[in-house]
Amino acid sequence: MKPIHKKLLSSLLFLIAITLQAQERKDTTLMREISINGQRQRISYRLDRQQIDASQVLTAQGGTALDVLRAVPGVVLDAEGSLSYRGSQSFLVYVDGKISPLTGTEALQMIGAANIRDIEILTTPSAKYKTDGDVGIINIVTRRAETEGWDVSVNGMASTWATLSLDAKINYRMGHHNIYVGGQGSDIHNKSQFQQEKFTTAGGASARSFADGTRFRNFRTYIGQGGYEFNTGWHRLAIDLQGGRTINPRGGDMLYETELNPNLSLGEVMDSHDRYKLTKYLFQASVDYTWKLNERGDEISLSNRLRYDRFSEEYTESNMFNLAGERMEGTRGYETEHHWDCDGALSYKLHYRPQGILELGSQYTTYSEEGDYRICYWNLPTQQFVWQDDLYAPFYYRRQVISGYAQVNDRIGPLQFDAGLRVDHLIDDMDLPTITSRHKRYTELYPSAHLAYNTTKAGTFTLGYSRRTNRPGIWKLEPYITYEDYHTRIIGNPDLESEYIHSLELSWRKTFGNTQVTATAYVRRRTGVVDYVRRAYDVGVTLDSIVNAGNGWRKGLEVQVTTKPAPWWQLTANGDLSFHNFRATYEGCISQHSTTGTVGWINNFRLAKNTALQFDGHFVSGHHLTQGWEKAYVYFDLAARQTLLQGKLQLGLVAHDVFHTARYHSLRTQTFLSSETWVRPTYPNIVFSISYHFRQPTAKAKSGALSNEAEFVGKDF
């Protein structure tokens, strides 16, 4: 273990020891959620998940679900704003229990933090959930109207990075009926300074190239939503409609300087401008129906979701000019496609005893994509772009998954458990008539189990296990070259196999007076690890191809301590220390043993009744890549929130990376290639947000009459 990691671990353990000694020994551990001196915890726990209270994360103001998750140990955002958790960027995203119309980081950026009540992380999901996702499922629980009458919310934000966002939602609830309509428009920007040095050898020639400039990545969303809910307690019907457009551009503006062999003479300085844009016009409809069969609580549920992208286009553009402004090279790539996918589920819950539930279900998922890929190159003699007909590639892809599962959940005294088994039958078809085809049929089993034991003195222990997979989508399988920039090209792999994961974790949590301590040890075994491998493609040009790089173990420990040193100050310290063992099975990848970790120091201050301040410090240690290493860095965030008009209006101000210390420095090395990259986010990044929430309850709601989701106190209770 490196000295810096020893110091971090020692500091964290020392903090735990001090806080435990300083507290009373009276235990107040709860199974579901814990509050300290009446203040809801930032992170609470259930049998199979941890839950983050978005309202407690001030640094997420004006941000998205991505910013809320920064509070979680083991969460890291890279230089381009993509989220990884426990070393992986593969996870499923749900919104209110339904699969998101987008995936990964894009799905997290689609939901504004002001509209989020909680975020749930399921690292070992039960058998009733889909099996995709290396580190599990992230479920975003949005804010819902809880009383009868009108509920209106409006949220806006702007930042020094030219990020803008505005959303609004109107909800009306009356008796058994609830109607809502809303919309959002956002333009999220990510800017950074970029430098890279590469040494490549290809075809007997060598080159050392230098790049210096700026890179950006934006995410624009324009989505409308509406729905209707009917709930009598015996019958529940929910209809939700969403539609709109998403645009995801990224690119860079660089100066390139190249030295060529044999004497590494200095080449001409070139001016490069590269662009990528993914545009989608999407529509999604979902219908859910639940029928409660008896007073015991047995029920039948039926759900269906349909998503259709009537138009989706991936556009890539590379441009190379000399300093006189004359075009020397260039490409234009177009991948145009139509998507449609559908999910259906039928389940039956049997309460075979007061604490016991048996759930049986079947699910069906189908995803289809049809389109073509075209590219044209700049012809220097004719001074025009020329279509490359030999590279034209039409494609068709369809994946179907037919699933069945059984799961039991029960409680015996202080012991709570669930166990389940899922069967997936997969049908995978891909046809690229001009290149290749892929047809697969197979059936797999995915077990899961969770166990929780609650004691008065020792606290609560939970144990969870699940088997999961990462199945490659078509964008990872497409065997034609696309351009990230003129010196970096990417290609898919039609022979790519699925990655399989076994996840096991053991957690302990206990409250001592004003202090809550949580510790989680986890193990994750991955076979057929999917990752990009970089190799020399041409003189000064690299090619990133996606492969099954090898097998790996990740063993980690997460610790979080939350305490109140003073009535106006809540302190949370958390850390993640993991040991990674990767054994390469693909030529060009490097077997590695490494230790990585993160440390967070989160301070919440109550300056006045309606004024709050938050100051965070985060350290991210160095971590391995399949071909190299990324170095450690540290950053600090500062946020303030002011509440006005009896809680209806909130003003927020957030300064990210306030001391400008976040720097991303990575190295990749293999035969015939070495590269070193430096990325530094643009400074400053200051966000201003405003939120207005108005409720107008009906006369019936004001009188305290019973309704399904009302909250009651005093005599009405």
What are these regions (language model features)?
Residues Q23-L58, D78-E80, R86-S88, L122-T124:
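Short, acidic, small-residue-rich periplasmic hinge/interaction motif at the N-terminus
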